[in-house]
Each structure stands twice: as C-alpha cells, then as structure tokens.
Amino acid sequence: MSHTLKSKTLQELDIEEIKETNPLLKLVQGQRIVQVPELVLESGVVINNFPIAYKTWGTLNEAGDNVLVICHALTGSADVADWWGPLLGNDLAFDPSRFFIICLNSMGSPYGSFSPLTINEETGVRYGPEFPLCTVRDDVRAHRIVLDSLGVKSIACVIGGSMGGMLSLEWAAMYGKEYVKNMVALATSARHSAWCISWSEAQRQSIYSDPNYLDGYYPVEEQPVAGLSAARMSALLTYRTRNSFENKFSRRSPSIAQQQKAQREETRKPSTVSEHSLQIHNDGYKTKASTAIAGISGQKGQSVVSTASSSDSLNSSTSMTSVSSVTGEVKDIKPAQTYFSAQSYLRYQGTKFINRFDANCYIAITRKLDTHDLARDRVDDITEVLSTIQQPSLIIGIQSDGLFTYSEQEFLAEHIPKSQLEKIESPEGHDAFLLEFKLINKLIVQFLKTNCKAITDAAPRAWGGDVGNDETKTSVFGEAEEVTNW
C-alpha cells in the first residue's frame, strides 16, 4: 500500500510522463518514483534532481522501526511480489501485516531509478552511454535519502541476494547496528571476484560487438538486441549448473508447443541442398530482415538470413525433408538433430530479456557489480571490514553456485561476528536464491522471529495491496517459468 510521507518530503514524479521516455516502466505496476535533489557519487560526480523508484507493502509503525528493506538483484525491479512473491504475505518471511516492506530500485536499472534511460536536464536527451558510474555504495546512500523522507528511523532487517546481497552488506557496514538492526545476505560476496568480473566483461563484449550498439548512442527502439540477447544467454549459463541443464534438457527436442510456434512462423522450407545446409548452419542467427530463408542457389550477393527457430521442423526426430540435390534430383533427407531444447530455452530467454531490458543499463549495472569491494577505500584487509558488521546476520549459500561460490558465503560467515550460515542443497546453481522459495522463506522467518521478536510477536495489522506470486507463476523479473514457454 502507499505510505504517506512524514518528513523531508521528496517531490513525487508523474510516472505516466516518464513512461513517454522510458517504455520499460510499464512492466512495474504500483511503484512510486520520487525526485532526489542532490547526491555526490563516489566518483565525485554530482547528480541533481534524479529519480529513485520504490514499492512498499504494509504500514510503517509510529516508531518508524518495523522496516524490511529488500534489495533486488542485477536485472530485478522494485516489485518483490514478482520475483520473490512466494515470500510475501501474511505469516511469510515478508509479512506486510507486521512489517513495512520496501524495495528500492538500484541506479542504472531501467525500471524507474536514475539510469541511462533518464533524460539529462542539461542536454534534453537520455544519458545513454554518458551515464555516470554508480556504485553499490551510491545506491545505499541514495536509498537512505528516500527512507528518511518516509519517516524511517531504523531498519529492522535488510535482505538481498546476489547484487542485492552486496547492498545488504553495504547497508550493514555503512550505517552500523544502530540504524540497521539485522542483515540477511544470500548468494553474494564481500568483493566481486575475478571470475565474476570476467563474465561481466564477456557479456559487455557481446553487446559491444553488435553493429547496432553505435557506442551506446542507439535509438531506444533500435537497441542492439542481438548483443543483449547473447549477453543474457551467457549470463544464464553462469546462473545454473551443468547438471541442472542436463537434468532439465538432456538432448531432447524443443517442446511440441515451441515446434508448433516455429512452424507457424516459418515462411517456407528450403528447396535445395544449398538452402537446407544454409538453414542448419545459420540457425539461431537473426538480422532485422530475418523473416524467411532466402535461397542462394550459388548466387553471389543475395541476402541470406535465417529465423532463430526455423530448424525445428528440420531437426525433429521424425522429420523427413524433401529437397533438391545438387544434381537436380529430388530425394528425402533426414538430418542428424542439430536443434535441442537447451538451445530453445536460451533463445526464449534471450528474446524475453530484450523485451524487458536496455543494453546501456545492462552495461551500467554490470560495471556497478565490478566496483563491489567492502574493503575498497576503507582498509586493506577485507576481514577487518567484515569484523565491523556487528548486526545479527544470516548468510545463505548455495552448494552448487558456481558464480558466488559457497566458499565465499563461508568466508562471510567466518568473519562477520554474529552470523549464522545456512546451506541450500540445490542443483540449480546461483539461481536457486530465486527458485528455492520454501526453504528460503523458512530460514528468514526463523531468523526474524529470533531477532525481530517485538515485531513478529506483535498483533497483525490489516493492510491493502497486492500479495506475492504463486511459485509456479511465470515471473517478469525472476526465474520462475512455465516450461511450455520453451
């Protein structure tokens, strides 16, 4: 539900007006956007009159201390109900009948806060590639300004996973136990590793290699979708594991629904051996003109493109394609399978992503991740910083996480004095923090009942607003999916 501003009121912006310059805002329902007058970024750059988006559930109590701050991950939004929905509701981890729950959108994200899609007041056009570097610490400081405007006196618990876990750690380290009472960090790290930095670089290079990138000065309606899609596919492989893909896909063909969709989209089948070979070779390659398979018949200079899904009909286990041989004879060819369910899944995810994200924003946020280091400009020894985090802390790691490894969670728990470490046994890798809802809910509920007892034991209050998604419902910003989509 909406919350009445109590002090230091920030100007609320008209979301409908912002949608005219940022079409992705329509994806987040029920959020608010306020204008923050000024912030000096870590880099020294001063930003003025910039937006911060947030969404709330529940009611702030008179003491202003029943606050849960939820921090979203890399491509998430302020809509916790979408990506952590099964944790949101009465008697769940995020209980709006007892807590005032708020999620603030990080800078660089395309979902309402200051980002490359924001209009630069000095130039009258979007910041685009001239968007200044914003760090995790910059986010925390900007978000603190918004919390102050809402009348928040202290945070009962800050909770986040992956990039959100970085924010949780910074909240605890920056403001101490008097303001941040408790902290939960899932699948994160004290500093961004060389492994993670390298993956971010590979994903950015995918975007840079797209000819439509244009140094970042592309029209929003013509962004480098091929590069952004490839970056997303690359990222997804780091979020899961080899075994999770093998169990889910093996060498199976795409679903019947996906094959039927491909057949509807296919303009015509190849009629020559050359076209047939070309179709297999270029399957998955797209250009603006990729609406059909163009036959080459050995002719130079003829445009040749392929649809991403055209090989579904060629590569199903029962397909027999009639083509003309190079000698002009017609014969039946049954090719070896070259199109698999795993490919269909990646292409589906790439297409889904380019319809909900912006390439410059992706670059900005991955660079934000690269800056994360709790010891940076504080001390030389990272353990020294962790020892200053005196809040009761719950560290949750995933045994199969290859991106933010379980050993990194052990390191956090070892050096944060009042911490407890919990392990999620899941084959899903890093994404388990967005999939293993029941276990995560149980762990957080237990932690809050122990450390926020005055709030969790209080009588529940009636509240209005949306509740979370069922865990089987497809999420816009999370990882819950309908398997028939691919």
UniProtKB/Swiss-Prot annotation:
Q: Further remark, if any? A: Present with 2240 molecules/cell in log phase SD medium.
Task: Give the gene name.
Answer: MET2
User: Where does the AB hydrolase-1 domain lie?
Assistant: 66-436
Please give the SUPFAM superfamilies that the UniProt record associates with this protein. Answer: alpha/beta-Hydrolases
| An annotated GO BP | methionine biosynthetic process
Question: What organism is the protein native to?
Answer: Saccharomyces cerevisiae (strain ATCC 204508 / S288c) (Baker's yeast)
Return one GO MF term.
Answer: homoserine O-acetyltransferase activity
Aminoacyl-tRNA synthetase as a keyword of this entry, yes or no, is: no
Q: What is this protein called?
A: Homoserine O-acetyltransferase
Active site (UniProt): S162 (nucleophile), D401, H430
UniProt lists compositionally biased (Polar residues) regions at 250-261, 270-280
Region annotated Disordered, chain positions:
248-281
Report the PANTHER family cross-referenced here.
HOMOSERINE O-ACETYLTRANSFERASE
Q: Which GO terms describe its cellular component?
A: cytoplasm
